[in-house]
Amino acid sequence: MNKHFLFLFLLYCLIVAVTSLQCITCHLRTRTDRCRRGFGVCTAQKGEACMLLRIYQRNTLQISYMVCQKFCRDMTFDLRNRTYVHTCCNYNYCNFKL
């Protein structure tokens, strides 16, 4: 019985590890296409997606921000002469490719 339980537990851990969503993190990516702060990879938890926030001023990309985000949803809004574009996705490293 214990061997079967251990086998099933290891199989479950392997499946979870293989199917976990991986996202790029970058807390400050500049127009020169370079991450200045927080570059890495996060593993999305339950209910999280990969998120990319792009901030434009006069239709020119100023900075972007990438992270694992809970309650992520696609949206665009304008505030103080800037346009904020939130984009969410659900496959590995997708927030870097958008």
UniProtKB/Swiss-Prot annotation:
Subcellular localization(s) per the UniProt record: Secreted
Protein name in UniProt: Prostate and testis expressed protein 3
All residue ranges annotated as the UPAR/Ly6 domain in the record: 21-97
Similarity remark: Belongs to the PATE family.
Signal peptide: 1-20
Tissue: Specifically expressed in prostate and testis.
Membrane-spanning segments: none
Broad class of where this protein is predominantly found: secreted
Keywords per UniProt: Disulfide bond, Secreted, Signal
Disulfide bonds: 23-50, 26-35, 42-68, 72-88
Segments forming a coiled coil: none
Cellular compartments per GO CC: extracellular region
